[in-house]
Amino acid sequence: GDDAYGDIPVNLAQVMLGSTIRVRTPQGKKVNVRITAGTQPEAVLRLRGMGFADRGRQGDLYIRTHLRLPEPGDEELRGKLAELFRDMGMKF
């Protein structure tokens, strides 16, 4: 079979905490994709047998994650984020 490729947007909470996202396969079927906690931006997830069929074989579907960041928000929210990032040992 032939492999298929696609992209999905993920947010910070989804990649840090883990999540399930519904995606559409090339055949139009909707399937759940598990985003595990700690998934890195631009990670490529492989869905075996979800690509294009060719000569009796089924290809795989490869999905790349793209991190979408939220708007910075107000001063209070930025303060909470700064505290969280400091607690995580992040420098900024």
Regions found by a protein language model. Give the residues of each.
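Intrinsically disordered, low-complexity linker/assembly segments
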Residues: G1-F92
